């Protein structure tokens, strides 16, 4: 079973496409040296850690105005 589950993540974000974009951006930030916002991540990979941050409400999603 995957952690965090897609069902949990979809409660935080209204679109799978937006979720992928946000996770990719946050994973890139982590790779570039940003501070991890979860204390003991389950995943050792940046994408997994980004997913855990979103599931734990550690990352605020902000809509850009067009």
From Swiss-Prot:
Record keywords, A-Z: DNA-directed RNA polymerase, Nucleotidyltransferase, Transcription, Transferase
An MF annotation (GO) of this entry: DNA-directed RNA polymerase activity
Catalytic reaction equation(s): RNA(n) + a ribonucleoside 5'-triphosphate = RNA(n+1) + diphosphate
Biological role stated in the UniProt entry: Promotes RNA polymerase assembly. Latches the N- and C-terminal regions of the beta' subunit thereby facilitating its interaction with the beta and alpha subunits.
Family: Belongs to the RNA polymerase subunit omega family.
Signal peptide interval: none
EC nos: 2.7.7.6
GO biological process, one term: DNA-templated transcription
Quaternary state and interactors: The RNAP catalytic core consists of 2 alpha, 1 beta, 1 beta' and 1 omega subunit. When a sigma factor is associated with the core the holoenzyme is formed, which can initiate transcription.
Full protein name: DNA-directed RNA polymerase subunit omega
GO cellular component, one term: DNA-directed RNA polymerase complex
Cystine pairings recorded for this chain: none
Organism encoding this protein: Geobacillus kaustophilus (strain HTA426)
Pfam families: RNA_pol_Rpb6 (PF01192)
């Amino acid at each position: 079973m995957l952690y965090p589950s897609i069902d949990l993540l979809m409660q935080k974000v209204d679109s799978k496409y937006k979720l992928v974009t946000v996770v990719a951006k946050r994973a890139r930030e982590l790779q570039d040296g940003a501070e991890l916002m979860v204390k003991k991540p389950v995943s050792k990979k940046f994408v997994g850690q980004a997913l855990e941050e979103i599931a734990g409400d550690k990352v605020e999603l902000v809509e850009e105005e067009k």
